[in-house]
C-alpha cells in the first residue's frame, strides 16, 4: 500500500509540474520581434496570475481590432509605477509588445506610453529589483 501511495504521489507531481511549465511557456511568442500599436484602452484587468491590457486599434480596412497584451502580475507591475488605476477604458495609449507567432493581434506586454507621455514598463521581476549580493572585493 505504501508503494502504491508513493507511486501515485510521484505520478501526480510529474503531471502537475508539466502543466505548470507549459503555462509559462513562451513557445507562442516571437521574442525576436516587437510590435507597437496605438489605440484606445478597451479593458484593463489588474489581477493574478496575469494582468491584461486590451486595446482597440484601427486597422487598414477602416475597422478596428482588439489587441490583447498579457502582462505580469500586479506585484511586478507596481515596480514600474503601475497602479490598478493607471489606465481605464477610453484612455489613448501606445503599447509595445512581443507579438503572438500565430498572427493574432496581441502578445506579451513590454511597455505603454500614456497620453501624458508617461512610460510604464512590464515590471521587474524580484531578481531584477534585488539582484543577488556580489562577494566583497578587496
Enumerate the predicted regions with their spans.
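Short boundary/loop segments of OB/S1/cold-shock single-stranded nucleic-acid-binding domains
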Residues: 20-35
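Short nucleic-acid-contacting surface segments enriched for D/E, G, S/T with interspersed K/R
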Residues: 79-95
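Bacterial N-terminal signal peptides that target proteins for export
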Residues: 1-8
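Short aromatic-glycine-enriched beta-strand elements
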Residues: 47-58
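Cleavable N-terminal signal peptides
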Residues: 9-10, 20
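OB-fold/S1-family single-stranded nucleic acid-binding modules
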Residues: 100-124
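Conserved hydrophobic positions within beta-strands
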Residues: 37-41
Amino acid at each position: 500500500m505504501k508503494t502504491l501511495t508513493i507511486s501515485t504521489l510521484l505520478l501526480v507531481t510529474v503531471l502537475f509540474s508539466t502543466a505548470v511549465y507549459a503555462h509559462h511557456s513562451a513557445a507562442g511568442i516571437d521574442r525576436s520581434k516587437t510590435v507597437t500599436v496605438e489605440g484606445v484602452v478597451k479593458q484593463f484587468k489588474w489581477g493574478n496570475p496575469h494582468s491584461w491590457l486590451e486595446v482597440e486599434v484601427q486597422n487598414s480596412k477602416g475597422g478596428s481590432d482588439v489587441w490583447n497584451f498579457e502582462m505580469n502580475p500586479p506585484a511586478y507591475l507596481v515596480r514600474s509605477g503601475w497602479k490598478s488605476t493607471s489606465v481605464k477604458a477610453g484612455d489613448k495609449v501606445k503599447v509595445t509588445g512581443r507579438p503572438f507567432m500565430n498572427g493574432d493581434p496581441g502578445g506579451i506586454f513590454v511597455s505603454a506610453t500614456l497620453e501624458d507621455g508617461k512610460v510604464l514598463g512590464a515590471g521587474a521581476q524580484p531578481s531584477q529589483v534585488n539582484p543577488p549580493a556580489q562577494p566583497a572585493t578587496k
